[in-house]
């Protein structure tokens, strides 16, 4: 899935480059592109370098926002569970039935609300790049070049960020499971469940689950968009 997202985004960049060349060559039909000049993605152009840096920042920013969103949504569920335990003490003994529907409804609303900003980020970022460079340089060619460079930055960095998050999160998750099965280190010492190493792996699993299940896979559509 990650590789297909990278290849798909690469095809979109090729289409973007070809369309720019076509519109620039037919400025009489498309007045906005009239006398725009040649658009190149030469690294000697400072706006291209700026676009690469800005585009490379997007996957990290997207992943960070997604990770904090998971924490806030989980926190709202913890508060709801505590409230139900307080109002219905018999839940722990099986005498009272918890309100599952409210918890699911609360989590669904929190998930949708928290993903609004990450969803808008890849949509608004190209507009910010284009009009920002256009305002600074006054050149449409430089603005389009910076926009294309930002797309390249997202593709390259996003691909490796997604791989890092999914594989790294999976490693943290499996580390906890290995301690539960009785992990033997290189010195022959066995670390069982409840050991200090296992407690550290639980912390790693807490980060690893949203890392591999939320932020990592979510970077794929961000690359394509």
Swiss-Prot record:
Subunit and partners: Homodimer.
An annotated Gene Ontology molecular function: diphosphate hydrolysis-driven proton transmembrane transporter activity
Compartment annotation: Cell inner membrane
Name of the protein: Pyrophosphate-energized proton pump 1
Highest taxon of source: Bacteria
Cofactors, names only: Mg(2+)
Pfam families: H_PPase
Family according to the record: Belongs to the H(+)-translocating pyrophosphatase (TC 3.A.10) family.
Catalytic class of the enzyme: translocase
InterPro entries for the chain: PPase-energised_H-pump
Membrane topology, from the record: Multi-pass membrane protein
Catalyses which reaction(s): diphosphate + H2O + H(+)(in) = 2 phosphate + 2 H(+)(out)
Segments crossing the lipid bilayer: 5-25, 47-67, 116-136, 143-163
GO CC annotations on file: plasma membrane
Job description of the protein: Proton pump that utilizes the energy of pyrophosphate hydrolysis as the driving force for proton movement across the membrane. Generates a proton motive force.
Key words, A-Z: Cell inner membrane, Cell membrane, Hydrogen ion transport, Ion transport, Magnesium, Membrane, Translocase, Transmembrane, Transmembrane helix, Transport
PANTHER family listed in its UniProt record: K(+)-INSENSITIVE PYROPHOSPHATE-ENERGIZED PROTON PUMP (PTHR31998)
Coiled-coil regions listed: none
Enzyme Commission numbers on file: 7.1.3.1
């Amino acid at each position: 899935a990650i590789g297909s997202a990278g290849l798909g985004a690469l095809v979109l960049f090729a289409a973007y480059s070809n369309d720019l060349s076509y519109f620039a060559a037919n400025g009489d039909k498309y007045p906005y592109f009239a006398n725009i000049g040649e658009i190149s993605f030469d690294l000697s152009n400072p706006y291209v370098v700026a676009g690469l840096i800005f585009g490379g920042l997007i996957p990290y920013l997207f992943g960070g926002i997604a990770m904090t969103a998971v924490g806030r949504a989980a926190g709202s569920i913890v508060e709801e569970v505590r409230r139900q335990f307080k109002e219905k003490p018999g839940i722990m003994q099986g005498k009272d039935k918890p309100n599952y529907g409210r918890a699911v409804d609360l989590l669904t609303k929190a998930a949708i609300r928290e993903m609004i900003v990450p969803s808008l980020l890849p949509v608004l970022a190209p507009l910010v790049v284009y009009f920002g460079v256009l305002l600074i340089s006054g050149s449409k060619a430089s603005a389009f070049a910076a926009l294309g460079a930002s797309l390249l930055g997202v593709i390259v960095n996003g691909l490796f960020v997604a791989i890092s998050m999914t594989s790294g999160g999976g490693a943290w998750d499996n580390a906890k499971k290995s301690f539960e099965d009785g992990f033997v280190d290189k010195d022959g010492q066995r670390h069982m469940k409840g050991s200090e190493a296992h407690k550290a792996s639980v912390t790693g699993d807490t980060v690893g689950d949203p890392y591999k299940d939320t932020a990592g896979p979510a970077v794929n559509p961000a690359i394509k968009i």
